[in-house]
Amino acid sequence: MTYKSDAIKLACSLISKGKIDQAGSVIDGEYPFVPLIKGKRSYTPREMTKVFISDGFIDRYRGTKLIYPPALRLLSIYLPKQFPYHKNGKMSEAHIGYWELFPTIDHLVPIARGGKDEESNWVCCSMLTNSIKSNWTLEELQWELKPKGDFHEWNGLIHWFIQQVHSDEKQLENSYIKRWHKTALDCAGDIRRFTDIGVSY
């Protein structure tokens, strides 16, 4: 196996000897240029919720517990000073929990690296981890994919969110809360598969 740094070293050595064509062949063969293709799309709350539930609200790259997005938003509504929210994600004005604990969908194999935009290539991770991973592969980052979480042990507070909105229905006046609440109910079938025993909140 030729390390990428070794390929560069060899190419530089060949250049010093005036062997430009050979240097080019080394790069073409050992460390070729592959243009990154930008590929980004928005996912519906339902698509995201299904992935979050399937992965057990666990960051599949770090193994940390994550929180159902509207549960964090609801927390900010009740505790605006202690857990501030910013609609544009301004880090100087929003709680760090919106990056550390907020789940999103990531492409296991980045679209820019030839990955497919399909469920088999989707995993749950935090906004923070998603930002770090960017268009890199797990091999390049020397990361490993963590096992899915156990929904019986951790449900991302999705049950708390549903129950709290049911007990405080005025929160449905907030369009974000209303949209995600409907999504949670629409995904009841996915949730029910994991609720045959007690679930911690």
Each language-model region and where it sits:
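A boundary/linker detector
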Residues: 1-50, 56, 63-69, 199-201
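Short flanking/linker segments adjacent to small metal-binding domains or redox-active Cys/His motifs
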Residues: 163-201
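A generic secondary-structure signal for well-formed alpha-helical elements
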Residues: 66, 129-133, 149
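Short Cys/His-rich "knuckle" micro-motifs
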Residues: 69-72, 134-138
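Short Fe-S-cluster ligation motifs
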Residues: 87-104, 110, 152-176
